[in-house]
């Protein structure tokens, strides 16, 4: 039963980390590590290797990963996320739907047409009257331009196409826009980020804004940046979407998750992407 | 399902005589352990790659027995010293009897 986890233990671990932090704030001399620099992120800032994975004070999840996980991401051959990119490459030129077209029929060479696209998503999509992320955008092209059915969220072909499109922006800085028609959706996402939820009554910000660099159970808390997504997650033993990660983070505090692809998670995705504006895309990343 | 299983290899195309080269392999495979249950509580049958072998010009140079606790998409790498040019043949054996193969030539100069 390798998948069995105790929610109570997880809850206790999370409360323990937040509790111990409160104590550290009260009396900094208590903790040697804290007294050293007063900042658990100082070690990452000081490491020149991480320069490419930072933008000012923003740090990619890569920085917080173990050397073994980093090595897996660094080598495209070892990186199992590249298998999803390969799947997507095959999907790209597959003819489907009543219009008799493939993605390639209209967008030709993805290396040119899709370069820099994914780092500007989610964005306001007039056809939806709300935000679209890359998955939504792909499905819009399927229904409208290919006359093909939508691909199911988290299905192999949709994960593959998302990975393939995102991969064309690897190395480019995240650069979402949050003004104009996107503004009200951004505000919704921001509200979500700061709202305490679940039985443990904890907001995203309390873990990822206030406590990065601290341990939570066996995990090293990161800033919760999205520049590596979609990602190959070792715990999942598979490739997965950012919304799947959001779902896990909601469950972590024993809150009811929203459906993947929902407006709530898409607005949140814009807020999270904006927090990371300037960080370079790592799609596909490898995470624990 | 079987269409999803793809072996990948990375082998230098050329090597100097007696140079030690690194061979990397990865096969996309779920490595279902046989220990997990589905939502109905029924055991999901075991299906793993249980063996991987490599031969150089027909002579075995590497063999691994894989067990159910090994992660999905098993990655294996090893080092090899070649004194002559030849073919490396890779074989992965699945619980269901399927055999997946890959081949690459190395020119030793």
What feature does the model see in each segment?
Chain A
Residues 89, 95, 163-215:
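Surface-exposed interaction/gating patches
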């Amino acid at each position: 039963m390798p998948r069995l986890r105790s929610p109570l233990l997880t809850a206790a671990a999370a409360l323990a980390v937040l509790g111990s932090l409160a104590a550290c704030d009260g009396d900094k001399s208590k903790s040697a590590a804290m007294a050293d620099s007063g900042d658990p992120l100082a070690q990452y800032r000081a490491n020149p290797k991480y320069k490419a994975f930072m933008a000012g004070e923003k740090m990619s999840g890569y920085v917080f990963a173990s050397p073994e996980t980093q090595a897996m991401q660094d080598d495209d051959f070892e990186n199992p996320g590249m298998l999803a990119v390969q799947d997507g490459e095959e999907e790209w030129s597959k003819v489907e739907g009543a219009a008799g077209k493939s993605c390639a029929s209209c967008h030709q060479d993805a290396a040119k047409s899709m370069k820099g696209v994914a780092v500007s998503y989610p964005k306001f999509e007039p056809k939806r009257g709300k935000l679209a992320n890359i998955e939504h955008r792909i499905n819009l092209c399927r229904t409208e331009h290919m006359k093909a059915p939508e691909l199911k969220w988290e299905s192999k072909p949709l994960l593959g196409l998302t990975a393939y499109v995102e991969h064309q922006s690897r190395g480019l800085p995240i650069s979402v826009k949050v003004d104009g028609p996107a503004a009200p959706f951004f505000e919704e996402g921001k509200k979500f980020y700061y709202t305490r939820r679940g039985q443990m009554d904890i907001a995203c910000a309390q873990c990822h804004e206030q406590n990065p660099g601290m341990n939570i159970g066996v995990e090293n808390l990161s800033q919760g940046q999205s520049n590596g997504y979609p990602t190959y997650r070792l715990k999942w033993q598979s490739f997965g979407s950012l919304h799947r990660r959001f779902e896990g983070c909601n469950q972590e505090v024993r809150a009811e998750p929203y459906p993947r692809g929902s407006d709530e998670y898409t607005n949140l995705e814009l807020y999270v992407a904006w927090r990371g504006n300037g960080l370079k895309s790592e799609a596909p990343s490898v995470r624990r | 399902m079987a269409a999803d299983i793809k072996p990948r290899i990375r082998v230098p195309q050329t090597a100097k005589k007696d140079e030690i080269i690194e061979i990397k392999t990865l096969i996309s495979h779920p490595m279902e352990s046989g220990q997990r249950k589905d939502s109905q509580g029924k055991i999901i049958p075991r299906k793993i790659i249980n063996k991987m072998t490599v031969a150089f010009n027909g002579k075995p140079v590497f063999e691994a027995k894989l067990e159910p606790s090994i992660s999905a998409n098993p990655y294996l790498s090893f080092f090899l010293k070649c004194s002559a040019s030849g073919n490396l043949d890779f074989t992965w054996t699945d619980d269901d009897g399927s055999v997946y193969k890959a081949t690459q030539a190395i020119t030793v100069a």
